[in-house]
A protein has these predicted regions:
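Flexible, surface-exposed loop/linker segments and immediately adjacent secondary-structure boundaries
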Residues: 26-193
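Short, surface-exposed loop/turn segments at beta-strand-coil junctions that are enriched for proline
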Residues: 267-273
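Short beta-strand segments of immunoglobulin-like
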Residues: 202-209
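Short beta-strand elements
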Residues: 290-306
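Enriched for extracellular/lumenal, surface-exposed ectodomains of secreted and cell-surface proteins
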Residues: 278-294
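Beta-strand-rich structural segments
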Residues: 211-228
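Short flexible loop/turn segments that cap and initiate beta-strands
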Residues: 223-248, 276-278, 295-296
Length: 306
């Protein structure tokens, strides 16, 4: 079981990454992000000096992160944004900005593979490039895949501006571009994301009794979007939450029917926590490439005290 302590992670990030020493003692370089929640082997560093990655590793601008076939890794950025890399993926963070777009917050470049990301609202957007595509987004989530046959882009929430050599479009929440190339006319390629990862919990109205933790059954099912019609599809699931006193399994996998059931343990908030208002948000994504046709699962659970 892995304890999700987002506030602790945030504090640790700023304590550790406010400055990162380089060779000259008179000069420091701020870290852009931190590596976390690694599965299998991951490498990180400058392109010609990559080393085996580890949880808590500080990532500087121009660093690359590369996952092996069964590898996964989460990158937490210092602005609060988050990226989840899937297997056989290579991404540059803080990549060099083009002359006409120096005003963007920072730039990511996908060399190969696939990732999911959520980018928080900011004064300037984040830019993402790869395969002849340029994306700009803020306060939005997306899945981005680059393969030999084309590019897949899906926007589960928010809005993303996408452009290539011949055209540009605004992808709204629930829309995607499937197998597009740098010379395609993008407005003709827009379609809806057809499926969704649905979540529900038992009991549906949990109650804290004193200081005792609760063990709850959490269910997953891929369904046709807008319906409860099941979709038979196996795959790995990545689960996260905005609550610090929550334990979840390290691994969740849907069976061939597209279903899964797991147990999560939720403890009451700390006695001195005056910010907790009783609602815990659970957010799940398909944790591998090839699932750009499945929208994120989102569940808000209301807890009461007895």
């Amino acid at each position: 079981m892995q304890s999700i302590r987002r506030c602790v992670l945030t504090i640790s990030f700023f304590l550790l990454s406010s400055t990162f020493p380089v060779l000259s003692p008179a000069k420091t370089v701020p870290a852009l992000a931190v590596l976390s929640r690694i599965k299998s082997k991951v490498k990180a560093g400058y392109s010609k000096k990559m080393i085996e990655g580890f949880n808590g590793q500080m990532l500087l601008r121009r660093y690359r992160v590369r996952t092996e076939k069964k590898g996964r890794a989460t990158i937490f950025f210092n602005d609060g944004s988050e990226v989840r890399l899937f297997g056989e993926t290579e991404l540059t963070i803080g990549a060099k900005k083009s002359r006409n777009y120096r005003w963007v917050r920072y730039r990511l470049f996908l060399h190969t593979g696939s990732f999911w990301g959520h980018f928080v609202r900011g004064k300037n957007p984040v830019e993402i490039g790869g395969g002849g595509m340029r994306l700009q987004l803020s306060d939005a989530s997306l899945r981005f895949s680059r393969g030999k046959t084309g590019i897949d882009i899906a926007v589960p929430s928010g809005m993303a501006k996408v452009s290539n050599k011949s055209s540009s479009v605004k992808l709204l929440a629930g829309q995607r571009l499937y197998q597009v190339r740098k010379n395609d006319f993008l407005p003709q390629k827009i379609s809806l994301i057809p499926n969704q990862l649905k979540l529900w919990i038992e009991p549906s109205a949990p109650v804290f009794k004193g200081k005792e933790s609760l063990k709850l059954n959490l269910h997953f099912q891929i369904v046709r979007y807008g319906t409860d019609r099941p979709v038979d599809r196996p795959g790995s699931v990545y689960l996260k939450s905005n609550y610090y006193n929550l334990k979840i399994p390290d691994s969740i996998r849907l069976n061939k029917d597209g279903k899964a059931k797991t147990t999560i343990e939720v403890a009451p908030p700390r006695s001195n926590d005056r910010t907790f208002e009783g609602t815990v948000t659970l957010h799940s994504i398909m944790d591998q490439s090839g699932y750009n046709d499945v929208q994120d699962g989102l569940l808000k659970v209301r807890f009461t005290s007895h």
